[in-house]
Amino acid sequence: MSNTHPFVGEKISYEKGLQFWDDFSEHYSNRQQGDIPCRIIDRLFETGMLTEDCNVLEIGSGPGTYSLELAPRVRSVRCLDSSPRMLMRLMSKASESGIGNIVPVEADWNSYEDGSEYGCCIATLCPGSGSRESVARMEKLSNGSCVLVSWTCNHGDDLNAQVWKALGKDYGYGFRGSTEVQDRLSSEGRDVKVELFQTDIEMDIPVEELVAKEVSSFKAYGNNMDVSDIVRSILEPDADDGIVHFRATNEMKLIYWAV
């Protein structure tokens, strides 16, 4: 798979990249992560990176995949995200679940300022969170631990790469297999721990649901091309009465260290 992210190939500006996630928020799903978020949080408690009296800063909280699991087990979670729609989804779910210790913050992490200290700063699938600058900000705000969660393999994105290929663009997500972040953190003297988590995903998805997701994605890129026919041409040969039987093993990476 190509290592060129569509953002890079299409020369999407930083500001448009932020807007992408707000525009795409309705179709953003945690289904491809399976039970990994729960297992990661359990592991962070086992290792002492998280404790019950911990105030947590989550960077890139999205609609609450990790926040909603974290909040009942810690003192508080401050959820930072640049997308107001993502935060609306998060707070709606928190209200439905009776969770009252989540504080939503609509802000861009790269310009965020906070005079507080947190027992743990955790970045969950937040683009660029492993950069030197981002890690330095995380460590400045944490008096306990720092955590990075990222994909190494998400087969849910294979369709997106196939659509780009049909358009003559060689884009993909092969860069997720890189060890650059943990290698750099270790070389700079941190006692970094790295663990991989796999999950088997099995689900039946209507073709039209996947069509709507990809159409939304391409609109968010600012591309007015209607890719619906391309998506259908990819999916329908293997679909069963309009249903795609999705089966895959996905993998995520957990990086953590004490500050």
Regions found by a protein language model. Give the residues of each.
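Class I SAM-dependent methyltransferase SAM/SAH-binding core
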Residues: P63-N110
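A short acidic, Gly/Pro-enriched loop at the edge of an enzyme's catalytic core
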Residues: E113-C120
